[in-house]
Amino acid sequence: RPGRRSKQVADWLQKQLAVSTKLEFNEIDLRAIDLPFLDESKIPALGQYEHSYTREWSSLISSYDGLIFVFPQYNWGYPAVLKNALDYLANEWKDKPVSLVTFGAHGELKHR
């Protein structure tokens, strides 16, 4: 989306966390990843990916110990591009700690 703000929020978050943690951060920009709408013929749980971009996406996510998703809320939900990226994989997400940082025009709620 033009004028997106996730990068600014992610940069701010990384600076805040750098004060109190030794975690290493890498940015994954789904615009740069540019996955097409899910087009694998087999379910992701099988891990039998036919497309090279799916195998690359799988390898990238598998290389991380945990994830922090930073994304805008659209109509109280998450963006379709994120849903699509999540749907491409299955086992790669299993047992991986995840945090969500969201923002939107309607205000935010603290979720626990």
Model regions and ranges:
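N-terminal beta1-alpha1-beta2 submodule of the flavodoxin-like/Rossmannoid cofactor-binding fold
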Residues: 1-71, 76-84, 88
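Hydrophobic/aromatic residues located in beta-strands of well-ordered beta-sheets
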Residues: 25, 95-98
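Short, conserved loop/helix-junction motifs that constitute active-site signature segments
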Residues: 89-95
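Short, glycine-/small-residue-rich phosphate/pyrophosphate-handling segment
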Residues: 97-112
